[in-house]
Every structure is written in structure tokens, then in C-alpha cells.
Curated annotation (Swiss-Prot):
Gene3D superfamilies: 3.10.450.40. This is Uncharacterized protein YqbS. InterPro entries: DUF2634 (IPR020288). It comes from Bacillus subtilis (strain 168). To B.subtilis XkdS.
Length: 141
């Protein structure tokens, strides 16, 4: 004799695809603080792109090896030419970003040498829409 009634449950399989939303806390990069504000969609992806471009891969144990980039290895190498650096920058940026499932492609690179730095603009195609990114990359940036 059970204390509760026996109820038969019917197993229902849901074949619909679960869509994960991108939701994260906003980072105040000027003050180096995480805020209470929750961001989603393109704004969350844009923050991921910024974080990936400004974090050296393997430098921080708090991040997995999928986070960050290896741009500094190329940009700080005084023995490589600017032409080689311009050739490598798109590959290294794409490798830094493509680990994120929300990002489908990184395209339309434009790279311009400015003093010791490179002004880089490119397009990030995501499942939320398209982002136009412009960054200045360099050894001391």
C-alpha cells in the first residue's frame, strides 16, 4: 500500500530544437568591472568579440583554451614583415571567434597599418544578425 496514488506518466518526446539564448552580465571595460546589467543577443556577442580580441589565449587559467587570441605572438615579432602580419591577422581573429556557436562566419577584413599598430575592420555573421567590428591591434594596444 503506497502513501501516494500511483499515477502513470506518458513519455512525451519533444523533437523541436532548443535554441539557446545568449545572456550574460555586461562588462564595464573602462573600469574593469562586471555590472549587474544582463545583456543578450548582438550586444552579448559583441562583448564576446571584444573580450576575445583583448585576451591573450592561454594567459589566464580562469578561461578555457577556446577564449582569447594569439595575435600578440605575431604582432610583437620584430622579425616578421608587415605584409606577413597583415596576412596572419584575419586567420588569427577568425580562430579566436569561431569557437562560439553563435558565430557562423568572420569576413570582409580590411587592414591598414597605422604607425606601430594595425586598424582592422571586419564583419561577424551570427545567428542574431551581423556585427561590424573595428579595432586597433598592436604590440602596445
Amino acid at each position: 500500500m503506497a502513501l501516494s496514488p500511483e499515477i502513470e506518466f506518458e513519455d512525451i518526446e519533444d523533437d523541436s530544437e532548443v535554441i539557446e539564448t545568449s545572456q550574460t552580465y555586461k562588462i564595464d571595460f573602462e573600469n574593469g568591472r562586471i555590472t549587474n546589467e544582463i545583456i543578450t543577443g548582438l550586444e552579448a556577442i559583441k562583448q564576446f568579440v571584444y573580450l576575445s580580441l583583448h585576451t591573450e589565449r592561454y594567459a589566464y587559467s580562469v578561461y578555457s583554451h577556446d577564449i582569447g587570441n594569439e595575435l600578440q605572438d605575431v604582432l610583437a615579432d620584430n622579425e616578421t614583415t608587415d605584409a606577413y602580419k597583415k596576412m596572419e591577422i584575419p586567420r588569427l581573429i577568425e580562430e579566436a571567434l569561431i569557437y562560439d556557436d553563435r558565430i557562423s562566419a568572420v569576413t570582409d577584413f580590411e587592414i591598414e597599418k597605422q604607425g606601430e599598430s594595425f586598424r582592422v575592420s571586419f564583419t561577424v555573421e551570427t545567428d542574431e544578425g551581423t556585427l561590424e567590428i573595428e579595432e586597433v591591434l598592436g604590440e602596445d594596444v
